[in-house]
Amino acid sequence: MNKQKLELTWIGKEKRPKLEPRILVEDTEKSYHAKRRVTSADFFDNRLIFGDNLLALKALEAEFSGRVKCVFIDPPYNTGSAFTHYDDGLEHSIWLGLMRDRLEIIRRLLSEDGSLWITIDDNEAHYLKVLCDEVFGRANFISTLAWQKKYAVKSDSEFFSESHDFILVYTKARGNFRINRFGRTEAQDARYKNPDDDPRGAWTSGPLQRNEARDYAIFPIQSPKTGKEHWPPKGTSWRFTKERMVDLIAENRIWFGESGNNVPRLKRFLHEVNDSVPATTWWDYQGFGHNDEARRESKALVDDADVFATPKPERLIEKVLTLATNPGDLVLDSFAGSGTTGAVAHKMGRRWIMVELGEHCYTHIIPRLQKVIDGEDQGGISKAVNWQGGGGFRYYKLAPSLIINDRWGNSVVNPEYNAAHLAEALCKIEGFTYAPSEVHWWQHGNSSERDFIYVTTQNLSSEQLQALSDEVGSDQSLLVCCAAFHGVTAAKAAERWPNLTLKKIPKMVLARCEWGHDDYSLNVANLPMAQIEQSEPVAASTLKTSKNKKPAVSNQHQGGLFGDEEA
């Protein structure tokens, strides 16, 4: 009997992309750092990545799995009204599929005590909640927060004037998650007064009774000032025993009002309360900022530039990072938008990674970050954290696809890849860490202390393989990725050189990924149409032909490894 479960389903849910793990190529001309170190805690290895965010997440997976403390994302809301740099008028099925693919990688990137924070409106919030339950596990749902993004009523609203967005909070492993608390505010401390000049300082009062009747705690207490007796209200009882209540009255911890005749209440002194408070699920604009505030912040940093319609203010991100991270932790935003997450993380002493594909990566994010690093950005949270500048970031772009088709339709290694990039790409695909040795020419990467990889575009002879095997030694192993090997069969090679594993480029990777697919973005113009069931069945012969169709056979005109010309 099949065990059934509750799940969210949609058209195309079973289809998953075979993502190519691209390498990241730094453009040092766009990387930026401060002219001097401001503090010993300055970070310079932050990353700004230009490219499709699904491919970028996949590119980060090998190096950063289990290392990200907090992911904050503000994906297009699928409302048709998001920022003009995105086209977010997507059907529910496409949107859910795109989000699922990203969330699965995000979960792998999170540390065991890490958390995910997603802003969303009520158009997709409930679908997204169920989707996140499926990806992260319902037990790892922490809370849904309501952030008041607008403070004014929209008078022309058809039904309700929309004033808030949601923030879904998930953790990778609930048992490991520890959330910080907010520091007490002046407004919270201002609630504490000292009307009786108590030498212990300011205090506030709370109920002295509990909402249940316990016989041992039902008795009269007497006001020291007037002698008036007070009983707990019907259906309730005092919170303390008679003996403890006598002590509290003697210690002047029970307040009967200035007249001495008021309902008694328990004093709570300011110096006795925690200097921090837990966050609530209602985040009002006074404490957490609003959209208009975010627009002003963006306009102040980017001259003559359009801004996002629903940007997030720095105060909102600061609150998230206060709760979810500590100084030095790594923060990821794969929908960088105007770069607020990175800017705030930078000012708060967190390390960060941001991903953005739109041109606003150049028009908004880079100029903004440069001003942050130079200390010129004194808006947002800068004054609150005493930001003086410092640190830096490295700018990366996704490498092109490793495999392309040459003019005869044959799959070959992209000629844009030099030897170093090819070695790094194959390390990533094969699960090795790219770490070229300065001592051993054949060590391009490693997966352990004794397992290595060597990448070459040469055709290796049996003599070369023998020399390589001798140098590697019997106590180590080497994966050899080469264009071809001759003078020996694969079976004989395995017997003759047990410390070598031979694979041919590009054959070894052809079935591993979707090569040449550069855009998995949320732009509907670039998405394929969802396959809808046809009203008429497709002819069986057509299906059979399609299923059994073989790839073109290489002919005598087949090009070299890098296409028409060898690199």
Model-identified regions with their sequence ranges:
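Signature of N6-adenine DNA methyltransferases within the class I
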Residues: 112-113, 122-181
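PRPP-dependent phosphoribosyltransferase catalytic core
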Residues: 353-567
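DnaQ-like (DEDDh/DEDDy) 3′-5′ exonuclease domain used for proofreading
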Residues: 1-72, 79-101, 483-485, 508, ...
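Active-site-adjacent helix-turn-beta-strand microarchitecture at beta-sheet edges
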Residues: 3, 171-303, 318
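Glycine-rich adenosyl-nucleotide cofactor-binding module
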Residues: 42-43, 47-55, 59, 292-330
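SAM-dependent methyltransferase catalytic-core segment centered on the flexible catalytic loop
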Residues: 36-39, 54, 59-115, 123, ...
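Conserved S-adenosyl-L-methionine
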Residues: 3, 8-20, 92-96, 123-125, ...
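Coupling/switch/interface segments within P-loop NTPase motor domains and analogous charged loops
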Residues: 1-14, 252-257, 468-469, 476-484, ...
